[in-house]
């Protein structure tokens, strides 16, 4: 019977290709069902572990009609001009409440608007309420939900402005908000003439201004006017009773953050001159402090236009950056200053310092931390405890130090490791809410903190809960996920009782929430029982018809000895005696500075078999063996740069994956396709140009000509002029004449990802066509870097499946050495 089920998947094929521009097409039902499957609800739990908010969506997709609504693309933003909010949102459509307890039932939230389109959900500081926004056809409104009554209501009719982010923040009293509202004085939108008033001119007077290839930039004075209009808002204090207190005049507000005690507001406002080279986050901005009564306190700094920031992942703007409030103090501002001018090339002992200023902000700032590398963040605990981190990408170094903010002279190193070393990642500290409703370190009376993490190991990911003593640096393991389940901690419900909330899953069991008791009662003289589990949610399997998909975690070696992994997916009912299958390799390369780190195992063999329509996994439903997430490490140890041998390592990694599938008897080396998205598309084109391993390729939303990203790409830090040979060798466009394998190119017509302009696929297709390659280009209208419309996703699967069936599944066999996996004519 199982064998029969397997052959059903194999026999479901694709009809002959439709003519070009024949409209949106549908894939076979096997694939279409993955797109239309009901999405699993998302869950948010209060910090006390008493209530969970269940958010439901009608669908995981949008529609092409929704995507085709008017949209402005300005300053790196995509704006819905009708609502002054972001375009392309996927909304929550229903809310329910549920007790975090056994046998609890969902409580339907009442008072929701008709046809709700909800987002930006936030618990109140005291967690008796939840706020959220609802987006109508013409504006964004604020609602509040009372937990005890499960009733929601609209707080005010005022329209919020979400162009520059979440348009409201709770104040610590849980009775009021700081909002960014649309002022009545904003008036009508500017009329934009189609007749230009003159040329658009940019000029540089001898200064270096290296920048990534940002998209959706301002292009002319008309764009400037529209950006300024739609981003304009007014900061106001809004009470739950609907009362309004203006805090600041009208302007382009990027940040409106209340202090933990609710007495002050940190306002960051953007002002001219705007830029045609960089996005809004680098525009000039002024950082001010106001009282929530509207009284001006101080201008902290006026930050200039940031067009000349040094290049590279270890670079930073010169001067002040990252202004925020200390979570553990009533009203203490902190920020970072670069002592090296933000230039990673400078040799200097201290690169960043962190300074603080206490209310009323009249005294001299206090330096509380000096970083030898780039500041990486801080987790506040109390006036004697904080965890500061530093990072340096060039060496992959990451350091965590224990600091006493009141006496910061002697920080203590807690962890010093490589960011690539997942096996020795200590995890992240658990947090709790303090008297202000802000999250801070959860420190026990004995000076311990709780650490939780993914628990990467040679056995795969095994999430854990540890107790770590800040004084002795000793770790005590409290719990670790055990086979055959993948279980990860969500929150610590009650440390004294040993109760934690977890999400638990297996290959065929959908993730659900459980209460795990780490200290279950035991009878006298008996060994401790397995920690008790209490299931809290019962979300169903999203596609039960594919429960039989088989999954196996593979481990194998590359020819240079680097350890590799992949997840092998096989169709339901498949048996080894059925013989090798047509196969599909789906991957995304990653750079490493250490071969040992590159070979570390990631993922877990016990995670739920989530068959996503987005990756190659979907084609396990169509009779293919899928090598999902095959590791493609690009290693450059010591002074060597990974990309200097990119092509060689790329081909060797792909060959090793195919060889392992052949060794297992499940992969037909004569019928293998390869695919990837974004940098995975770049990988795909390079593999087809530089090897004979594959019968066909599918490249979605990639960049193929690296001379169009001359100031670095992905994790390449060198510019084109520093490493022209590397850029050229890595560019599939430069090797279009070598392409002898069928390649399907798919791209969103409105891709706004840095580097992957749609013209990349257009020009690459033209080059391939000009050189006589077998290729096809599909542009998806209105789609960005990730496709969201149901029509687009279904058509994407139609194209991918048809391409694989024609050029891989039905490819004519050729001789191959199944012992080595080498194909005849391999380069």
For every predicted segment, state its role.
Residues 18-549, 563, 599-600, 809-827:
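Beta-propeller folds
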Residues 569, 586-587, 675, 746:
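Short hydrophobic segments within beta-strands
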Residues 91-96, 100, 600-827:
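Active-site-proximal cap/loop segments of hydrolase catalytic domains
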Residues 287, 333, 414, 513, ...:
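Conserved hydrophobic/aromatic pocket- or pore-lining residues that grip, position, or stack substrates
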Residues 591-593, 626:
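Serine-hydrolase catalytic-loop signature spanning alpha/beta hydrolases and amidase-signature enzymes
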Residues 570, 578-590:
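Short beta-strand element of the alpha/beta-hydrolase
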Residues 1-4:
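Positively charged n-region of N-terminal signal peptides that target proteins for export
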Residues 13-15:
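N-terminal signal peptide c-region/cleavage motif recognized by signal peptidases
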């Amino acid at each position: 019977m199982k064998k029969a089920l397997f052959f059903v998947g194999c026999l479901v094929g694709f009809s002959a290709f439709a003519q070009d521009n024949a409209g949106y097409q549908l894939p076979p039902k096997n694939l279409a069902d993955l797109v239309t499957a009901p999405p699993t609800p998302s869950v948010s739990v209060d910090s006390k572990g008493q209530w969970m908010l269940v958010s439901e969506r009608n669908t995981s997709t949008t529609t092409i009609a929704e995507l085709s609504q008017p949209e402005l693309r300005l300053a790196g933003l995509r704006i819905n001009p009708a609502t002054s909010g972001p375009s392309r949102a996927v909304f929550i459509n229903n809310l329910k409440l549920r007790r975090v307890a056994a046998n609890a039932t969902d409580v339907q939230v009442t008072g929701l608007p008709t046809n709700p389109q909800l987002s930006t959900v936030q618990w109140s500081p005291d967690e008796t309420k939840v706020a959220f926004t609802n987006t109508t056809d013409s504006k964004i409104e604020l609602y509040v939900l009372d937990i005890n009554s499960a009733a929601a209501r609209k707080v005010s009719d005022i329209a919020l402005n979400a162009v520059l982010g979440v348009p409201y923040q709770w104040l610590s009293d849980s009775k009021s908000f700081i909002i960014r509202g649309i002022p009545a004085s904003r008036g009508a939108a500017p009329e934009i003439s189609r007749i230009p008033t003159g040329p658009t001119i940019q000029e540089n007077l001898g200064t270096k201004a290296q920048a990534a290839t940002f998209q959706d930039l301002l292009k002319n004075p008309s764009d400037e006017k529209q950006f300024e209009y739609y981003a304009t808002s007014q900061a106001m204090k809004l009470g739950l009773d609907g009362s309004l207190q203006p805090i600041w005049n009208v302007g382009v507000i990027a940040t409106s953050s209340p202090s933990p005690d609710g007495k002050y507001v940190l306002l960051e406002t953007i002002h001219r001159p705007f830029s045609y080279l960089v996005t809004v986050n680098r525009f000039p901005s002024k950082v001010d402090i106001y009282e929530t009564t509207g009284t001006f306190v101080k201008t902290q700094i006026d930050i200039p236009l940031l067009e000349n920031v040094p290049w590279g992942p270890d670079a930073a703007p010169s001067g002040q950056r990252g202004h925020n409030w200390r979570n553990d103090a009533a009203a203490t501002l902190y920020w970072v200053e670069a002592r090296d001018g933000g230039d990673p090339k400078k040799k200097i002992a201290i690169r960043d310092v962190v300074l603080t200023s206490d209310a009323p902000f009249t005294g001299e700032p206090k330096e509380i931390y000096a970083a030898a590398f780039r500041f990486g963040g801080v987790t506040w605990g109390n006036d004697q405890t904080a965890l500061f981190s530093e990072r340096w990408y060039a060496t992959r170094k990451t350091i965590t130090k224990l600091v006493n903010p009141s006496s910061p002279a002697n920080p203590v190193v807690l962890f010093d490791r490589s960011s690539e070393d997942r096996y020795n990642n200590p995890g992240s500290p658990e947090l709790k809410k303090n008297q202000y409703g802000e999250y801070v370190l959860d420190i026990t009376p004995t000076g311990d903190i709780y650490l939780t993490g993914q628990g990467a190991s040679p056995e795969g990911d095994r999430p854990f809960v540890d107790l770590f003593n800040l004084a002795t640096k000793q770790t005590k393991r409290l719990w670790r996920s055990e086979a055959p389940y993948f279980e990860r901690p969500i929150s610590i419900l009650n440390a004294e009782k040993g109760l934690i909330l977890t999400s638990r899953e297996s290959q065929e069991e959908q993730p659900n929430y459980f209460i795990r008791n780490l200290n279950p009662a035991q009878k006298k003289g008996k060994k401790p029982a397995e920690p008790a589990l209490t299931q809290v949610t019962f979300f169903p399997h999203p596609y039960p018809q594919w429960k039989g998909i088989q999954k196996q975690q593979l481990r194998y070696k590359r020819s240079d000895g680097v350890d590799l992994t992949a997840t092998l997916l096989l169709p339901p009912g498949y048996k080894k005696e059925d013989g090798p299958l047509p196969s599909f390799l789906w991957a995304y390369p990653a750079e490493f500075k250490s071969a040992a780190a590159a070979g570390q195992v990631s993922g877990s063999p016990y995670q739920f078999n989530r068959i996503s329509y987005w990756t190659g996994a979907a084609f396990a439903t169509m009779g293919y063996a899928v090598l999902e997430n095959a590791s493609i490490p690009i290693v450059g140890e010591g002074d060597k740069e990974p990309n200097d041998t990119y092509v060689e390592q790329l081909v060797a990694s792909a060959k090793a994956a195919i060889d392992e599938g052949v060794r297992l008897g499940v992969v037909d080396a004569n019928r293998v396709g390869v695919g990837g998205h974004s940098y995975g598309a770049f990988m795909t084109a390079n593999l087809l140009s530089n090897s004979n391993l594959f019968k066909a390729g599918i490249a979605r939303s990639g960049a193929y000509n690296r001379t169009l990203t001359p100031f670095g790409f992905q994790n390449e830090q060198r510019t084109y002029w520093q490493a022209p040979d590397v850029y050229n060798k890595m560019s599939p466009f430069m090797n279009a004449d070598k392409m002898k394998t069928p390649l399907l190119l798919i791209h969103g017509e409105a891709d706004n990802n840095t580097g992957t302009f749609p013209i990349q696929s257009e020009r690459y297709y033209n080059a391939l066509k000009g050189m006589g390659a077998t290729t096809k280009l599909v542009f998806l209208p209105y789609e960005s870097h990730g496709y969201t419309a149901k029509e687009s996703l279904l058509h994407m699967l139609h194209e991918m499946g048809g391409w694989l069936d024609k050029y891989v599944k039905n490819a004519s066999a050729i001789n191959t050495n199944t012992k080595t996996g080498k194909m005849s004519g391999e380069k």
